[in-house]
Amino acid sequence: MAESEGSNTENGKVGAVKSENLDRGVAAIKNQFLTTKEKFHAFIDADGKDVTEKETCSELSLNDAENTTRTENAAEPEAKRIKLDDGSSEGQDQPPKTAENKQEKKRARGQNKSRPHMKHSQFEENKLCPSVTQECASKCFFGDKCKFSHDVAKYVSQKPEDIRPNCHLYETFGKCIYGVTCRFAKSHLGEDFKNIINEELMKEWEGKVLVKNSLDKSLKEQLRKKKVVFEKSDKYLKLCFKSGDSSKMKNPVVKEDSAVQVTQKDSPITTVGAVTDEDVIKLRPCEKKTIDFRNKLYLAPLTTCGNLPFRRICKRLGADITCGEMAMCTNLLQGQPSEWALLKRHHSEDIFGVQLEGAFPDTMTKCAELLNRTIDVDFVDINVGCPIDLVYKKGGGCGLMNRTNKFEQIVKGMNSVLDVPLTVKIRTGVQEKVNIAHKLIPNLRDWGVSLVTLHGRSREQRYTKLANWEYIDQCAKIASPVPLFGNGDIISYEDANRALQTGVAGVMLARGALFKPWLFTEIKEQRHWDISSTERFDILKDFTNYGLEHWGSDCQGVEKTRKFMLEWLSFLCRYIPVGLLEHVPQKINERPPYYMGRDYLETLMASQNVTDWIKISEMLLGPVPPNFTFLPKHKANSYK
């Protein structure tokens, strides 16, 4: 410790940016790694080539600030940038502040709600017909009217160069279903551009289901034509309408017959052959599947970033419970494929749930019944914590906390049609200083909820202040014996330990998992992992491979993988390596200043400029296509 303190003092004399000069809310980093914005971007733009063999990244940051100027615009606004006062501007004439200058320095807050999205046609102009790609024996159904190309040779001549010489899908499964359209096709194409198949490797995967919960075509048609029958939901909803206000209803659960009565009423036809379930008695509430949630690490259902490849990363690094992204119940009932894609489950997710959002008992109950008989999940979660206006103004998300009667009907209705546990995720309240969760939790316990997850912030508060763990502790005691999980500001194993010292049954990780998915490993092994840039890059490699498996290895799949990687990199860049911190651990509400990493890759990963995120994606997924545009979900940076 004494040695490191001495080196910090010495570096401070040379002219490094001192940590004590940092603004409030900025993470404290060792002096030898701190730098200025100009030096940081100059180093990134030069690809680290200006560093000699004897000169390290940290030594570069000790040069005088006046000798380094940024030669081009970084394409980033002043929003969320930390101004480091290194004294270089003292005594210089500054231009008068005008209205235009004030406008430029205006902070960009919130989300980019109307983001540009690249259409499928923009990925490749000359798209090959699926009948050719899949090497179908029969001719194209559309014949001469087909709008896609059937000329394989022409397609290959216009196709961009392969990204890598080896295809992950072919090397893993023995066959790449994308054939000639694969961006790694040379490794599995034979004569006349025919797909090569590794029969031995394919046999190893034969009969195994890797991803569950796909939308069946026949079910999609039935949903769109409104031909699906919801027998249980209709019974429950009739009871609700008859009794009117749910507060007058003692127990609005569908009346169930005893096992003896069911066997007497139903006389199923005797079947021959495989065992069927026509004569199986449905589970009663007391016989529902139970899950021991206690002392498990729960990955939060994260919109956009909580996709299946990311969940696989977290699962491999120690997550116990995973949950799909928030799905709108009305969209599911309409059979929208994009919404059903959010329910997909990888076989490695052993405790997996789906999260539903809705504002009315009829749609939520019907959706629960539909999922109960069509997909494989371990629990269903109700989103009562979503703060966005689109959901809240319709009465969903946080809005349900103020609509107790409707909330009760939704919970009891879903419970009556589900064979798996029903869980609820809530916030402390809607208004910043008005906590109402403690009033709601006893009702949730009485309504039959199996788990409550409490985010220690209100809707209005968002992330402006730290989560209120004292209040979470109070609510956990009220919820007993129902387990309550706490959520908020956990970014190290020490934070998790402090949280578990309260009355909570476990912790949910959200932003902490986005910043550092190896947080699950740190908590289980009770250590601070000073992960290297190479190890972090290997995690991105795994995400790339998982993305190609999930979204495809053709042009469209590659660009989808890139899109979600860029969204994730907007969070990953906020991680500060343990070896650079003056005080371990990093605090989630502290912004990282400009610093030089221990190598070029670590410095590149620290950049909050979207052009540098794209540079990282190009290391894994090749160059971006022409006219590529990307606007992050949050108003931090943009690339056009």
Swiss-Prot record:
Domain of life, source organism: Eukaryota
Residue stretches of biased makeup (Polar residues): 1-11, 58-72
Location of the active site: 386 (proton donor)
Segments of skewed composition (Basic and acidic residues): 43-57, 77-86
Membrane as UniProt keyword: no
Basic residues bias: start-end ranges: 104-120
PANTHER family named among the record's database cross-references: TRNA-DIHYDROURIDINE(47) SYNTHASE [NAD(P)(+)]-LIKE
Function field: Catalyzes the synthesis of dihydrouridine, a modified base, in various RNAs, such as tRNAs, mRNAs and some long non-coding RNAs (lncRNAs). Mainly modifies the uridine in position 47 (U47) in the D-loop of most cytoplasmic tRNAs. Also able to mediate the formation of dihydrouridine in some mRNAs, thereby regulating their translation.
Protein name: tRNA-dihydrouridine(47) synthase [NAD(P)(+)]-like
Native species: Xenopus laevis
Origin organism lineage: Eukaryota, Metazoa, Chordata, Craniata, Vertebrata
Gene designation per UniProt: dus3l
